[in-house]
From Swiss-Prot:
It catalyses: 4-CDP-2-C-methyl-D-erythritol 2-phosphate = 2-C-methyl-D-erythritol 2,4-cyclic diphosphate + CMP. The lineage of its organism: Bacteria, Pseudomonadati, Pseudomonadota, Gammaproteobacteria, Alteromonadales. GO terms for molecular function: 2-C-methyl-D-erythritol 2,4-cyclodiphosphate synthase activity; metal ion binding. Binds 1 divalent metal cation per subunit. Pfam families: YgbB (PF02542). NCBIfam families: ispF (TIGR00151). 4-CDP-2-C-methyl-D-erythritol 2-phosphate binds at residues 10-12, 36-37, 58-60, 63-67, 134-137, 141, 144. It comes from Shewanella sp. (strain W3-18-1). This is 2-C-methyl-D-erythritol 2,4-cyclodiphosphate synthase.
Length: 161
């Protein structure tokens, strides 16, 4: 069995007058995130982790913010495309672990819905998906409520022929 680990990281600042979408879930908050796509910083980090595990670069390479085709793009569609690239190479998801770093809004009430989105889009069991949140104790840009950062790690496996 061949196993690969991928790590993804993404950051977006608050400031857009739009819904705040995190992991495909609309989270009530006073503002959305500034981005070329829908700004789903969680799915961007997971997509980057999958691409990293496959040595395929990052989401900026596959979905450049200079391409108007991705203006306002649904990040769930982008995530599924990244996972399709992995499946085309014979890989499947082992598990995903996500850490959302934000002083606000409160993430905990939305974690189960976020896990379900990832399980659905990655065709995984719910117990293979972990989403957690933390703060930076009011330090740095996330602590000042200027934006959200996310780290994601995926384990991908392929049976050897």
């Amino acid at each position: 069995m061949k196993i690969r680990i991928g790590h993804g990281f993404d950051v977006h600042k608050f400031g857009e007058v739009r819904p705040l979408i995190l992991c495909g879930v609309e989270v009530p908050y006073e503002t959305g995130l500034v981005a070329h796509s829908d700004g789903d910083v969680v799915l961007h980090a997971v997509s980057d982790a999958i691409l990293g595990a496959m040595a395929l670069g990052d989401i900026g390479k596959h979905f450049p913010d200079t391409d108007t085709a991705y203006k306002g793009a649904d990040s769930r569609v982008l995530l599924r495309h990244c996972y399709d690239l992995a499946k085309q190479r014979g890989f499947e998801l082992g598990n995903v672990d996500v850490t959302i770093i934000a002083q606000a809004p409160k993430i905990a009430p939305h974690i189960e819905a976020m896990r379900q989105v990832l399980a659905t889009d990655l065709m995984a069991e719910l117990d293979d998906i972990n989403v957690k949140a933390t703060t930076t104790e009011k330090l740095g840009f996330t602590g000042r409520k200027e934006g959200i950062a996310v780290e994601a790690v995926v384990l991908m496996s392929r049976k050897q022929d």
